[in-house]
């Protein structure tokens, strides 16, 4: 592990209102697990996504996994297409793999 916090860095670049929306959604998942598919969806191989609709009608995604019983945010992005880009999935899977090794 590198000690970097790429999701936190990404969030800090967003407008404050978007940060709050995404933060609330992550907290709902973290403290209300399990939650419904509208907010959280499995992506396979231990990877999940938090789905946030921002005020600007943009869609944000935070990809996460569990490590040592804790939810760990692995990658985040603004969704631009209906299907999650393979590159985004690969980044999250690699980070999850690095944590497990």
Q: What does each model-found stretch correspond to?
A:
Residues 62-63:
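Hydrophobic/aromatic beta-strand elements that line small-molecule binding cavities or substrate pockets
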Residues 1-59, 68-71, 78-101:
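Basic, Lys/Arg-enriched alpha-helical interface segments
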């Amino acid at each position: 592990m590198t000690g970097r916090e790429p999701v936190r860095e990404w969030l800090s670049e967003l407008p404050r209102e978007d940060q709050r929306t995404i933060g609330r959604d992550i907290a709902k998942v973290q403290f209300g697990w399990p939650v419904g598919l509208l907010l959280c969806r499995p992506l396979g191989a231990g990877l999940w996504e938090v789905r946030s609709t921002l005020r600007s009608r943009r869609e944000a995604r935070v990809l996460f996994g569990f490590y040592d019983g804790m939810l760990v945010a692995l990658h985040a992005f603004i969704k631009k297409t209906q299907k999650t880009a393979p590159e985004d999935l690969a980044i999250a899977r690699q980070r999850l793999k690095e944590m497990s090794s």
